[in-house]
Amino acid sequence: MTSERKMLVTSALPYANGHLHLGHLVEHIQTDIWVRTHKMLGIQCISVCGDDAHGTPIMLKAEQLGITPEALTAEIKLSHEKDFKAFAIDYDYYHTTHSPENQALATTIFERLQAGGDIVKKTIRQFYDPVKQMFLPDRYVKGTCPKCAAVDQYGDNCEVCGATYSPTDLINPVSVISGASPVEMESEHYFFDLPRYEELLKDWTRKGHLQTEVTNKLSEWFEAGLKQWDISRDAPYFGFPIPGVPDKYFYVWLDAPIGYMASFKKYCDERGVSFDEFWDKASKTELYHFVGKDIVYFHALFWPAMLAASGFRTPTAVYTHGFLTVEGQKMSKSRGTFIEARAYLAHLHPEYLRYYFAAKLNGRVDDLDLNFDDFVNRVNADLVGKVVNIASRCAGFINKRFDNRLSSELINQKLYNDLLSAREFVIDAFVSRDYARAIRQIMDCADKVNQYIDANKPWVLAKDESKLNEVHAICTMGINLFRILITYLKPVLPMMAKASEEFLNSEPLHWGSIDKPLLNHRINTFKPLMVRVEKEKIEAMLVQSKESLMTTPIKENTPVEDSNLISIEDFAKVDLRIAKIVNAEPVEGADKLMRLILDLGDAQKQVFAGIKKAYDAEELIGRLTVMVANLEPRTMRFGVSEGMVLAAGDGQGIYLLQPDAGAFPGMKVK
């Protein structure tokens, strides 16, 4: 199957100051399924993404860790790419906004906006941290809400009463970074004149480029009136300098969406593809963005206006999805439901999640809930019990009784055609992003196949040598029907599809390859394609997620204040002792915990320490370290912890304290 259509598809860029979590994966799995669907149709569908690598949070986190922002973002990019690969999320190019391509494009767009009279300079007043000597973004100021008097609220909105306000409206404002009281200062900023493009945006947003819910929301914003958009930030800042303007930088939200263009530009340079064919104002290609509902304002207003004003094409569509909740609630670190991708991967197969998300995504802006009982049921009953079971039941007979060769006839062409007739429905559902509808149809087809096998009972017929031809024909039918099902599921389950192609001894499956069944065809020995979800694995994942919070070595943005000082008498209450590690073993079922037996000279104590990822058990045995010997024992799921070993941490690594030569077990640390 081939097509003349050419498509460029993007997902929102993950921010490069932390690891991916399951909330990120909703969008990237949604995008990947859509792209794979179109590639199977023979369409030139290119998908690009990259890390959003600029801004104050990255600058501050790098400073806290004692590394450069470039080093931080490079490390996080590797982590993101590793997680995406593990979940079979396959971008044609994955880049970073901190790149020469992005700087060149951001500069070009800014200069075109400036030449067109779309850039306005204004003097603004904002909070300034006198200790850090920097202007403070809204989220880096906290204080008492001016509306309801709730304390410890951010500088842009109150999480208690929902009020929005300016940071300067806060009562008793404090810098989150240093703890100092900020002062108001003036600064000249650069603004994009968004109201100038109100009519263009009204026209664009009402022409089918957005979901109906998003269009309706934008109508509210139009009624409230569009405002000029501040696209500059003051030094110090990690980003691209504004050309010819000292100590001014492009705001991260100016160059972040341009990162889509930059990633594609890099792809074009390496593959010999025409960049202008996809981004020229008169382009006949298609451009699609997948984004979360929290950033729709940027993608449905600022972005198309900025593109149009600078002479580039606007998106064909912006597809918006809702948030991920877990067990009906916002993801929570304390409950262990703030689950990072790598914590999930330590316990569960990535395609369980791909299937579950697909079964819940419907093309609307609804939130998606991850309910673990439902998760187990859908994977075990539907995916394993219905689909994989078909291949498992039929392949055994073909492998053992018929030398791995399928029959030369298809005994139920009507049933084969019945499943084949669902193809257009399934494709249409995937293309319209109603994956849940596609999955329901596929499972209905799987039910028909299982009913066919149950009705014909090849396991009973196999006991009668005279019925072996029937067994051969029934199981050949089952294998071919499974082939249709796995083709339908291939955009969702690419890893299982690849394993199925190897089992079927076939070319890569696509939408047209199932027109003809496999007859008189030799297959390979069947190997399990997927196993059932064990609830214990989910529980272990949740435990690991909680432990990840408990063993976090540092807390970000916590200034040392006078209120945190203790007296020498308080410090003297802590009994610090030199301890020898006489035994160390990783705790089974815990991702970070190591069980240590510590010798204090006159006694031994058991301690559970979150150092499993930093050290091998063998290298710890015999080492001296420092422990808190008089800490109240704490009962954990794995046993009683009778103290605490001391370690340093920078957020990326953990380093046990070790005394100089001459220290011995039991020696008091003073």
From Swiss-Prot:
Residue ranges occupied by any tRNA-binding domain in the UniProt entry: 570-670
Cofactor note: Binds 1 zinc ion per subunit.
Location of the motif 'KMSKS' region: 330-334
A molecular function GO annotation: ATP binding
Record field: catalytic activity: tRNA(Met) + L-methionine + ATP = L-methionyl-tRNA(Met) + AMP + diphosphate
InterPro entries assigned to the protein according to its UniProt record, in alphabetical order: aa-tRNA-synth_I_CS, Anticodon_Met, Met-tRNA-synth_bsu_C, Met-tRNA_ligase_1, Met-tRNA_synth, Methionyl/Leucyl_tRNA_Synth, MetRS_core, MetRS_Zn
Keywords noted in UniProt: Aminoacyl-tRNA synthetase, ATP-binding, Cytoplasm, Ligase, Metal-binding, Nucleotide-binding, Protein biosynthesis, RNA-binding, tRNA-binding, Zinc
EC number: 6.1.1.10
Name the UniProt record assigns to this protein: Methionine--tRNA ligase
Gene name of this polypeptide: metG
